[in-house]
Protein backbone atom coordinates (compact mmCIF):
# COMPACT_ATOMS: atom_id res chain seq x y z
CA UNK A 1 0.00 0.00 0.00
CA UNK A 2 2.90 2.42 0.59
CA UNK A 3 4.28 2.08 -2.94
CA UNK A 4 0.77 2.29 -4.40
CA UNK A 5 0.11 5.48 -2.41
CA UNK A 6 3.26 6.99 -3.90
CA UNK A 7 2.34 5.90 -7.45
CA UNK A 8 -1.43 5.94 -8.01
CA UNK A 9 -1.99 9.67 -7.31
CA UNK A 10 0.45 10.59 -10.09
CA UNK A 11 -1.60 8.61 -12.62
CA UNK A 12 -5.03 9.35 -11.14
CA UNK A 13 -5.74 11.72 -14.01
CA UNK A 14 -4.78 11.18 -17.63
CA UNK A 15 -1.25 12.34 -18.42
CA UNK A 16 -1.25 15.05 -21.10
CA UNK A 17 0.80 13.93 -24.11
CA UNK A 18 1.06 15.60 -27.51
CA UNK A 19 3.29 15.11 -30.56
CA UNK A 20 1.36 17.06 -33.18
CA UNK A 21 -0.84 14.11 -34.16
CA UNK A 22 0.61 13.87 -37.65
CA UNK A 23 2.86 10.85 -37.13
CA UNK A 24 0.94 7.57 -37.20
CA UNK A 25 3.94 5.54 -35.99
CA UNK A 26 4.11 7.53 -32.73
CA UNK A 27 0.40 7.02 -32.13
CA UNK A 28 0.74 3.29 -32.75
CA UNK A 29 3.82 3.11 -30.53
CA UNK A 30 2.03 4.89 -27.67
CA UNK A 31 -0.52 2.06 -27.59
CA UNK A 32 2.14 -0.67 -27.37
CA UNK A 33 5.54 0.56 -26.22
CA UNK A 34 7.09 -2.76 -25.11
CA UNK A 35 5.60 -5.33 -27.52
CA UNK A 36 3.56 -6.73 -24.62
CA UNK A 37 0.56 -4.49 -25.25
CA UNK A 38 1.34 -1.91 -22.55
CA UNK A 39 0.55 1.71 -23.31
CA UNK A 40 3.00 4.47 -22.49
CA UNK A 41 0.88 5.37 -19.47
CA UNK A 42 0.88 1.85 -18.00
CA UNK A 43 4.57 1.37 -18.81
CA UNK A 44 5.58 4.58 -17.02
CA UNK A 45 3.42 3.59 -14.05
CA UNK A 46 5.34 0.31 -13.82
CA UNK A 47 8.60 2.26 -13.97
CA UNK A 48 7.40 4.55 -11.20
CA UNK A 49 6.54 1.63 -8.92
CA UNK A 50 9.82 -0.18 -9.61
CA UNK A 51 11.90 2.99 -9.17
CA UNK A 52 10.33 3.51 -5.74
CA UNK A 53 11.11 -0.09 -4.80
CA UNK A 54 14.67 -0.30 -6.15
CA UNK A 55 15.80 3.34 -6.06
CA UNK A 56 16.15 3.44 -9.85
CA UNK A 57 15.42 1.44 -12.99
CA UNK A 58 16.73 1.73 -16.54
CA UNK A 59 14.53 2.03 -19.62
CA UNK A 60 16.32 0.77 -22.72
CA UNK A 61 15.15 1.98 -26.13
CA UNK A 62 16.00 -0.85 -28.51
CA UNK A 63 15.13 -1.73 -32.09
CA UNK A 64 15.21 -4.65 -34.51
CA UNK A 65 18.56 -5.33 -36.12
CA UNK A 66 17.11 -5.30 -39.68
CA UNK A 67 14.61 -2.58 -40.57
CA UNK A 68 12.61 -2.37 -43.79
CA UNK A 69 12.12 1.06 -45.31
CA UNK A 70 8.75 2.80 -45.18
CA UNK A 71 6.42 3.69 -42.33
CA UNK A 72 3.65 1.39 -43.57
CA UNK A 73 5.92 -1.65 -43.56
CA UNK A 74 7.33 -0.66 -40.17
CA UNK A 75 3.84 -0.44 -38.66
CA UNK A 76 2.65 -3.73 -40.17
CA UNK A 77 5.69 -5.67 -38.99
CA UNK A 78 6.11 -3.70 -35.75
CA UNK A 79 9.65 -2.85 -36.78
CA UNK A 80 10.16 0.30 -34.80
CA UNK A 81 11.83 0.97 -31.47
CA UNK A 82 10.42 -0.56 -28.31
CA UNK A 83 11.12 -0.27 -24.59
CA UNK A 84 12.12 -2.67 -21.86
CA UNK A 85 13.10 -2.22 -18.22
CA UNK A 86 16.42 -3.22 -16.67
CA UNK A 87 16.45 -3.69 -12.92
CA UNK A 88 19.45 -2.20 -11.09
CA UNK A 89 20.41 -5.65 -9.80
CA UNK A 90 21.07 -6.70 -13.42
CA UNK A 91 23.42 -3.79 -14.15
CA UNK A 92 26.92 -5.20 -13.72
CA UNK A 93 28.96 -2.16 -14.75
CA UNK A 94 28.55 1.40 -16.00
CA UNK A 95 30.66 4.48 -16.66
CA UNK A 96 29.60 8.13 -16.77
CA UNK A 97 31.53 11.18 -17.93
CA UNK A 98 31.88 14.42 -15.95
CA UNK A 99 28.48 15.58 -17.23
CA UNK A 100 26.71 12.45 -15.98
CA UNK A 101 26.21 11.02 -19.48
CA UNK A 102 26.42 7.22 -19.63
CA UNK A 103 29.45 6.24 -21.72
CA UNK A 104 29.34 2.50 -21.11
CA UNK A 105 26.91 0.06 -19.56
CA UNK A 106 26.78 -3.70 -19.06
CA UNK A 107 23.68 -5.56 -17.99
CA UNK A 108 22.24 -9.07 -17.88
CA UNK A 109 19.23 -9.78 -20.03
CA UNK A 110 17.53 -12.70 -21.79
CA UNK A 111 18.15 -15.53 -19.32
CA UNK A 112 17.43 -19.12 -20.40
CA UNK A 113 15.67 -21.33 -17.86
CA UNK A 114 15.05 -25.05 -17.61
CA UNK A 115 12.82 -27.04 -15.27
CA UNK A 116 14.51 -29.26 -12.73
CA UNK A 117 13.19 -32.67 -11.67
CA UNK A 118 11.55 -31.00 -8.66
CA UNK A 119 9.69 -28.60 -10.94
CA UNK A 120 11.73 -25.51 -10.08
CA UNK A 121 13.15 -23.14 -12.69
CA UNK A 122 16.92 -23.33 -12.98
CA UNK A 123 18.82 -20.65 -14.90
CA UNK A 124 20.91 -22.35 -17.55
CA UNK A 125 22.46 -19.32 -19.24
CA UNK A 126 22.12 -15.56 -19.49
CA UNK A 127 23.14 -12.91 -21.98
CA UNK A 128 25.36 -10.02 -20.94
CA UNK A 129 24.93 -6.92 -23.06
CA UNK A 130 27.60 -4.25 -23.33
CA UNK A 131 26.84 -0.92 -24.97
CA UNK A 132 29.08 2.03 -25.81
CA UNK A 133 28.38 5.09 -28.00
CA UNK A 134 30.04 3.28 -30.93
CA UNK A 135 29.17 -0.42 -30.66
CA UNK A 136 27.41 -3.17 -28.76
CA UNK A 137 27.99 -6.86 -28.11
CA UNK A 138 26.33 -9.85 -26.46
CA UNK A 139 28.35 -12.42 -24.53
CA UNK A 140 27.52 -15.76 -22.94
CA UNK A 141 29.58 -18.28 -21.06
CA UNK A 142 31.26 -19.34 -24.30
CA UNK A 143 32.21 -15.80 -25.40
CA UNK A 144 30.83 -13.16 -27.75
CA UNK A 145 27.81 -14.43 -29.67
CA UNK A 146 26.69 -11.22 -31.38
CA UNK A 147 27.97 -7.70 -31.94
CA UNK A 148 27.36 -4.67 -34.09
CA UNK A 149 27.74 -0.93 -34.63
CA UNK A 150 25.84 1.62 -32.61
CA UNK A 151 24.86 4.14 -35.27
CA UNK A 152 23.07 6.40 -32.79
CA UNK A 153 26.28 7.80 -31.35
CA UNK A 154 24.97 7.45 -27.79
CA UNK A 155 23.65 4.72 -25.51
CA UNK A 156 19.82 4.64 -25.69
CA UNK A 157 19.21 3.98 -22.00
CA UNK A 158 17.24 6.27 -19.69
CA UNK A 159 17.53 5.94 -15.90
CA UNK A 160 14.34 6.59 -13.93
CA UNK A 161 15.06 7.60 -10.35
CA UNK A 162 12.76 7.03 -7.40
CA UNK A 163 14.82 8.99 -4.90
CA UNK A 164 17.35 11.80 -4.67
CA UNK A 165 20.78 10.92 -5.99
CA UNK A 166 24.16 12.42 -6.74
CA UNK A 167 25.17 13.20 -10.32
CA UNK A 168 26.70 10.11 -11.88
CA UNK A 169 25.27 7.76 -9.25
CA UNK A 170 22.88 5.57 -11.22
CA UNK A 171 22.32 3.04 -8.43
CA UNK A 172 21.09 4.99 -5.39
CA UNK A 173 19.77 3.18 -2.34
CA UNK A 174 16.09 2.40 -2.36
CA UNK A 175 13.95 4.82 -0.33
CA UNK A 176 12.06 1.75 0.88
CA UNK A 177 14.98 0.17 2.79
CA UNK A 178 14.04 1.57 6.19
CA UNK A 179 10.38 0.79 5.53
CA UNK A 180 11.25 -2.80 4.55
CA UNK A 181 13.16 -3.24 7.80
CA UNK A 182 10.21 -1.90 9.78
CA UNK A 183 7.88 -4.24 7.88
CA UNK A 184 10.13 -7.17 8.82
CA UNK A 185 9.81 -6.19 12.49
CA UNK A 186 6.03 -5.98 12.09
CA UNK A 187 6.01 -9.44 10.52
CA UNK A 188 8.01 -10.92 13.40
CA UNK A 189 5.85 -9.24 16.04
CA UNK A 190 2.69 -10.44 14.28
CA UNK A 191 4.08 -13.97 14.31
CA UNK A 192 4.78 -13.71 18.04
CA UNK A 193 1.30 -12.32 18.65
CA UNK A 194 -0.28 -15.16 16.67
CA UNK A 195 1.69 -17.71 18.66
CA UNK A 196 0.65 -16.06 21.91
CA UNK A 197 -3.02 -16.03 20.94
CA UNK A 198 -2.93 -19.62 19.76
CA UNK A 199 -1.29 -21.02 22.89
CA UNK A 200 -2.48 -18.77 25.67
CA UNK A 201 -5.55 -16.78 24.76
CA UNK A 202 -8.01 -19.64 25.31
CA UNK A 203 -9.30 -20.39 28.77
CA UNK A 204 -8.35 -23.64 30.49
CA UNK A 205 -10.93 -25.62 32.42
CA UNK A 206 -9.92 -26.34 36.01
CA UNK A 207 -11.76 -29.34 37.40
CA UNK A 208 -11.72 -30.55 40.99
CA UNK A 209 -10.89 -34.20 41.68
CA UNK A 210 -13.20 -35.78 44.19
CA UNK A 211 -11.94 -37.27 47.37
CA UNK A 212 -10.61 -40.78 47.02
CA UNK A 213 -9.28 -40.39 43.45
CA UNK A 214 -5.45 -40.43 43.34
CA UNK A 215 -4.46 -36.99 41.97
CA UNK A 216 -1.16 -38.27 40.54
CA UNK A 217 -2.92 -40.95 38.52
CA UNK A 218 -5.47 -38.46 37.19
CA UNK A 219 -2.74 -36.05 36.10
CA UNK A 220 -0.61 -38.67 34.34
CA UNK A 221 -2.57 -38.44 31.08
CA UNK A 222 -3.27 -34.70 31.18
CA UNK A 223 -1.41 -32.04 29.21
CA UNK A 224 -2.08 -28.44 30.06
CA UNK A 225 -3.68 -26.79 27.05
CA UNK A 226 -6.90 -25.61 25.46
CA UNK A 227 -8.03 -29.18 24.72
CA UNK A 228 -7.44 -30.58 28.22
CA UNK A 229 -8.44 -29.93 31.78
CA UNK A 230 -6.26 -28.86 34.66
CA UNK A 231 -7.10 -31.09 37.63
CA UNK A 232 -6.66 -30.07 41.24
CA UNK A 233 -7.35 -31.62 44.61
CA UNK A 234 -10.75 -30.19 45.31
CA UNK A 235 -12.46 -29.80 48.62
CA UNK A 236 -16.08 -30.52 49.25
CA UNK A 237 -18.18 -28.05 47.35
CA UNK A 238 -15.40 -26.97 44.96
CA UNK A 239 -16.72 -26.06 41.53
CA UNK A 240 -15.04 -26.19 38.10
CA UNK A 241 -13.87 -22.85 36.71
CA UNK A 242 -11.88 -21.40 33.83
CA UNK A 243 -8.55 -19.60 34.03
CA UNK A 244 -6.88 -17.54 31.30
CA UNK A 245 -3.60 -15.64 31.04
CA UNK A 246 -3.56 -11.89 31.32
CA UNK A 247 -4.25 -9.97 28.13
CA UNK A 248 -1.55 -7.39 28.82
CA UNK A 249 1.11 -9.25 26.82
CA UNK A 250 -1.06 -9.41 23.71
CA UNK A 251 -2.09 -5.77 24.14
CA UNK A 252 1.56 -4.75 24.38
CA UNK A 253 2.37 -6.50 21.10
CA UNK A 254 -0.70 -5.03 19.40
CA UNK A 255 0.19 -1.49 20.46
CA UNK A 256 3.77 -1.93 19.27
CA UNK A 257 2.59 -3.27 15.90
CA UNK A 258 0.27 -0.29 15.46
CA UNK A 259 3.06 2.12 16.39
CA UNK A 260 5.32 0.58 13.75
CA UNK A 261 2.56 0.73 11.13
CA UNK A 262 2.14 4.45 11.84
CA UNK A 263 5.91 4.86 11.59
CA UNK A 264 5.93 3.21 8.14
CA UNK A 265 3.56 5.87 6.82
CA UNK A 266 5.58 8.59 8.53
CA UNK A 267 8.79 7.36 6.86
CA UNK A 268 6.99 7.33 3.50
CA UNK A 269 5.71 10.91 4.06
CA UNK A 270 2.15 9.58 3.96
CA UNK A 271 0.93 10.63 7.40
CA UNK A 272 -1.61 12.95 5.80
CA UNK A 273 -3.32 10.23 3.75
CA UNK A 274 -3.66 7.43 6.30
CA UNK A 275 -6.84 6.62 8.14
CA UNK A 276 -5.13 6.80 11.54
CA UNK A 277 -6.94 9.26 13.77
CA UNK A 278 -4.50 11.56 15.52
CA UNK A 279 -4.84 14.81 17.35
CA UNK A 280 -3.10 17.48 15.30
CA UNK A 281 -3.69 21.12 14.54
CA UNK A 282 -4.74 22.36 11.13
CA UNK A 283 -1.27 23.79 10.56
CA UNK A 284 0.36 20.44 11.36
CA UNK A 285 -1.96 18.61 8.95
CA UNK A 286 -1.21 21.20 6.27
CA UNK A 287 2.52 20.61 6.71
CA UNK A 288 1.97 16.85 6.40
CA UNK A 289 0.02 17.37 3.18
CA UNK A 290 2.68 19.69 1.75
CA UNK A 291 5.33 17.08 2.50
CA UNK A 292 3.34 14.32 0.79
CA UNK A 293 2.56 16.57 -2.18
CA UNK A 294 6.25 17.42 -2.60
CA UNK A 295 7.28 13.75 -2.62
CA UNK A 296 4.70 13.01 -5.34
CA UNK A 297 5.65 16.13 -7.33
CA UNK A 298 9.35 15.20 -7.28
CA UNK A 299 8.57 11.73 -8.61
CA UNK A 300 6.26 13.18 -11.26
CA UNK A 301 9.05 15.48 -12.43
CA UNK A 302 11.48 12.55 -12.67
CA UNK A 303 8.98 10.63 -14.80
CA UNK A 304 8.34 13.62 -17.05
CA UNK A 305 12.05 14.15 -17.69
CA UNK A 306 12.56 10.44 -18.33
CA UNK A 307 9.65 10.13 -20.78
CA UNK A 308 10.83 13.11 -22.83
CA UNK A 309 14.28 11.57 -23.07
CA UNK A 310 12.78 8.19 -24.01
CA UNK A 311 10.92 9.73 -26.95
CA UNK A 312 14.02 11.70 -27.96
CA UNK A 313 16.01 8.48 -28.17
CA UNK A 314 13.09 6.71 -29.87
CA UNK A 315 12.93 9.29 -32.66
CA UNK A 316 16.72 9.18 -33.11
CA UNK A 317 16.35 5.72 -34.68
CA UNK A 318 14.49 7.44 -37.54
CA UNK A 319 17.09 10.18 -37.81
CA UNK A 320 14.63 12.92 -36.93
CA UNK A 321 13.43 15.00 -34.01
CA UNK A 322 9.83 15.17 -32.86
CA UNK A 323 8.13 17.90 -30.87
CA UNK A 324 7.00 15.61 -28.07
CA UNK A 325 5.29 17.21 -25.09
CA UNK A 326 4.23 15.52 -21.86
CA UNK A 327 3.04 17.12 -18.63
CA UNK A 328 2.79 15.23 -15.35
CA UNK A 329 0.75 16.76 -12.50
CA UNK A 330 2.41 18.68 -9.68
CA UNK A 331 -0.56 19.25 -7.38
CA UNK A 332 -2.22 16.24 -5.75
CA UNK A 333 -4.91 17.81 -3.62
CA UNK A 334 -8.35 16.25 -3.50
Predicted regions: what is each one?
Residues 1-83:
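Extended, helix-rich architectural segments
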Residues 226-233, 252, 256-334:
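C-terminal helix-loop subdomains that flank or include functional centers
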Residues 25, 35-43, 51, 178, ...:
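Short amphipathic alpha-helical segments
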Residues 3, 7-12, 32, 47, ...:
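Conserved aromatic-histidine-acidic binding/catalytic patches
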Residues 145-282:
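Extended, charged amphipathic alpha-helical segments
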Residues 40-49, 69-73, 78-81, 88-96, ...:
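Intrinsically disordered, low-complexity boundary segments flanking structured domains
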Residues 44-48, 63-65, 194-204, 208, ...:
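Long, hydrophobic, amphipathic alpha-helical segments used as structural scaffolds
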Residues 48-168:
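Extended, regular secondary-structure scaffolds
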